[in-house]
Amino acid sequence: MTVGAGGKTSADADPLMLVRAIADADRRAAHALNLVPSENRISPLASLPLASDFYNRYFFNTDGDPLFWEFRGGEDIAHIEALGAAALRRMASARYCNVRPISGMSAMILTVAALSPPGSTVVSVDQNSGGHYATPALLGRLGRRSRLLNCKDGEVDESELAEVLAPGDVALVYVDVQNCVRVPDFRRMSDVIREVSPGTRLYVDASHYLGLVLGGLLANPLDCGADAFGGSTHKSFPGPHKGVIFTNAEDVDESLRSAQFDLVSSHHFAETLALSLAALEVEDRMGDYARATNDNARRLAGALADAGFRVYGDSATGYTDTHQVWVELDGVAAAYALSNRLAEGGIRVNLQSSMPGMSGVHLRLGSNEVTFEGAGPQAIEELAGALVTARERALGPRTVHEIRGRFGAPFYTDPEKLKVEAGL
């Protein structure tokens, strides 16, 4: 018997026992209600490749060259990646779609490397304004200089942007707003860039609200003058953990393809197949899903505000334009007591301590996953009621079951129909 980190012995690491623990946790997860805005639940259809042999395989022959099958196994299904990319292009109204990134951060690295030379300046959004925490440090590691922009309630200060651009050394404006109930006006940003520094590229990291863009609820950055946009595919878009980048510019696409050769080896074939199936499955439902997601977010925000929670945002405009709802809480102890009661009752929430315009520990909630599973107005009202209850006491043992009983049809293929029609 050996003793490892944390005092664990080899007896504690029996693989069968560990698998049982995973299975038990997975069963609980299947019934839980997840209100974390940076997560979503992949559909049964899209999840199939993740349990297939393709999870073990490389796939490099993106052009389908019959003389380039150095790694075998993908010949018969290579077209699925192409079909999925085409569906994504249609949803984004984009000429080009790059599905090589393996995550949102991978997409960020690829974009920065492709669209800015070493030593140049890249402008991003300050974390205190909702920007991604890692962007400035990542830029430094890649040999770029970082400049930060303020963004208040979704509004970028145009005079500040013009001032940052004026020296002429900015290669890329990388709009990385992740914490947002309002989305910046990309058209106005593009206009400033084209006037002050026409050679500067504009990229929108839409990781959090990608599904709302693809569903037509929020403005398409390409239509607003951005050179490219993209991000992760597992937040408001119900896909696997992957990344995607869209552009209409041939030179941008070529730069991305050139950079990916060095920065992305395996693009994780099973996950790419899963992304393709997710895109093909939701393409015709994406508009309805995006609208329902925002409707549910606004309904949740309003119900919580009516119950006395301090909800961030303007009640006159529905508190949020995205899937996110922010709620201020009364100190760390109260925040974790609420989160623990909810988790024990099967409702998962996201605590944050660095949200723009808010102090202390607070809730960052998302309507995206429960909407994908079929939550409608009544279910959302009862979810809000569960949060109200959890401020004072534990939830009842059937609370989640009863809320799920209010769900309508999900935005994905019925699993039983899938088994019959696919012969599974």
Swiss-Prot record:
GO molecular function, one term: pyridoxal phosphate binding
Modified residue annotations for N6-(pyridoxal phosphate)lysine: K235
SUPFAM superfamilies: PLP-dependent transferases
Cofactor annotation: pyridoxal 5'-phosphate
Single GO biological process annotation from the record: tetrahydrofolate metabolic process
Pathway noted in the entry: Antibiotic biosynthesis
Record keywords: Antibiotic biosynthesis, Pyridoxal phosphate, Transferase
Catalyzed reaction equations: uridine-5'-aldehyde + L-threonine = (5'S,6'S)-C-glycyluridine + acetaldehyde
Enzyme class label: transferase
Record note on pH: Optimum pH is 7.5.
InterPro entries for this protein: PyrdxlP-dep_Trfase (IPR015424), PyrdxlP-dep_Trfase_major (IPR015421), PyrdxlP-dep_Trfase_small (IPR015422), Ser_HO-MeTrfase-like (IPR049943), SHMT-like_dom (IPR039429)
EC number in record: 2.2.1.-
Biological role: Catalyzes the condensation of L-threonine and uridine-5'-aldehyde to form 5'-C-glycyluridine (GlyU). Forms (5'S,6'S)-GlyU. Has no activity with alternative amino acids, such as glycine or serine.
Protein name per the record: L-threonine:uridine-5'-aldehyde transaldolase
